[in-house]
Amino acid sequence: MNKIAIFGSTGHIGKNLISFLTNDRNYDLILFSRNSKKNEMLDNLFPESSLVIEEYDKFESDEYDVIINCIGITNPVDITKYYSKILEVGEFYDNKIINFLKKSPSTLYINMSSGAVYDTKFDSPVDDKTPTILDINHNNSVHYYALSKINSETKHRLNSELNIIDLRIFNFFSKYIELNSGFFLSELINAINNNMKFVTNDVDFVRDYINPYDFFSLIKNCVQTNNINDTFDVYSKEPISKSRILEEMSNRFDLEVEIIDKDAFSSPTGFKKNYYSISRKTAKISYEPKYSS
């Protein structure tokens, strides 16, 4: 049985991992959280799972086969609001794990990184040859988020003797998403739930949403991997465009869509026309998604 510690267990991805891992007898979970009120939420979400939830100051007192780090400010609303804390929070918990690994080198560290590390305009999808381009003279909330992820990944590669996998997540969606998070799909679902017209601009874009089942499959493959220090772009079987999403939602839920001038909206994390990767390096750890976006 693999003993797995999860940092950021009350977040969107953390909840998904709990939902899958608690139903698999191969895994024993130790969850870590800073917010006791959110801990109660986890107990309510998974009442039959007998969750073990600890505070972070207890982390070093135990041993783990795997540590999964889901900590981070990820939704557009919070990135804009708390951008000054992004680097500080990410650095603190990442260092905590790195220091643990140096004393326990057999432990595997799976870190949730982001496609934002490329810090590009995403005029086209990225691949294994895409460089990271930083405009260091014009920092904003978008760059601080990217810098936080770049900082972590760089540190991980420098510690090449440690077992670390960085998973660059571009888009992820599930029933555990917070509908006030400011993501395109969460706003779309809010419109459907409230029988409201969905207003958007006339600019199309492409996204790649990994299915939770595929994501769990990827995590299992990572857990079974030994002696590795690498990064992987996460992808589904096929991406999807905004226009197709709107068409599907309109047909299935009678959603009324109003298209207005493209300059009427701006994203707090910057516009990304093709926010996905065509890298298939993850095949190295036998990952093959079954589901499209």
Give each language-model segment a name.
Residues F7, F32, C70, Y109-G115, ...:
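SDR active-site strand-loop-helix element
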Residues I4-D24:
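N-terminal Rossmann NAD(P)H-binding glycine-rich loop of SDR-like oxidoreductase domains
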Residues K96-V142:
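Conserved Rossmann-fold NAD(P)-dependent oxidoreductase catalytic core, especially the SDR/UDP-sugar
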Residues Y82, I86-I97, L101, I110, ...:
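Short alpha-helix in the Rossmann-fold core of NAD(P)-dependent oxidoreductases
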Residues N195-M196, T200-S293:
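C-terminal substrate-binding subdomain of Rossmann-fold SDR/epimerase-dehydratase oxidoreductases
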Residues T154-R207, P212-F216, M249:
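NAD(P)-dependent short-chain dehydrogenase/reductase
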Residues N137-I165:
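Active-site Tyr-X1-5-Lys
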Residues S50-E91:
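NAD(P)H-binding glycine-rich loop region in Rossmannoid oxidoreductase-like domains
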